Amino acid sequence: MKGLILAGGSGTRLRPITHTGAKQLVPVANTPILFYGLQHLADAGIREVGIVTGDTGEEIRGAVGDGSRWGLEVTYLPQEAPLGLAHAVLIARDFLGDEDFVMYLGDNLLRDGITSFVDEFKAHRTAAGDDLCSAQILLAPVPDPQRFGVAEI
């Protein structure tokens, strides 16, 4: 299983903080928020991670490096324009190949990490057979979902 972190957004809702830097590098408890995602992927046993970057790609590359501090191998995947989540996966198709992957939004913070979700997905995939369990989506209720996007399934 591989990891795919989307880190291309500009962070307009975090301005003025993001006028001078990547929103994924805004610190939470003195740690860039992106670093929590990288650690969560590593904790879940994922070693190969692709990071889709936008305008702040060089800043993110400078902060993350090769990923070795988390025991990861990081590949950077530039996205020329913010064309959505599906486009980011399209850009990453050569990196992902035919492997299962976790897509993690680089500005999200999950308090308890993702290990239990990855384990649950693997267990369901094994029990149901590869063709029957092909996706798992994590969503959280928010008071004003229109500000963030509404999932339709």
Predicted features and spans:
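A structure-centric signal for secondary-structure junctions around beta-strands
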Residues: M1, A22, L132-C133, R147-F148
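Short beta-strand-to-loop element that shapes/binds the nucleotide-sugar donor at the catalytic cleft/hinge
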Residues: S134-I153
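A generic "binding-loop/recognition-motif" signal
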Residues: S10, G21, T56
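Active-site glycine-centered loops adjacent to acidic/histidine catalytic or metal-binding residues
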Residues: G9, D107, P141
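Conserved N-terminal catalytic core of the sugar/cofactor nucleotidyltransferase
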Residues: K2-I5, R13-P16, V26-P27, T31-L105, ...
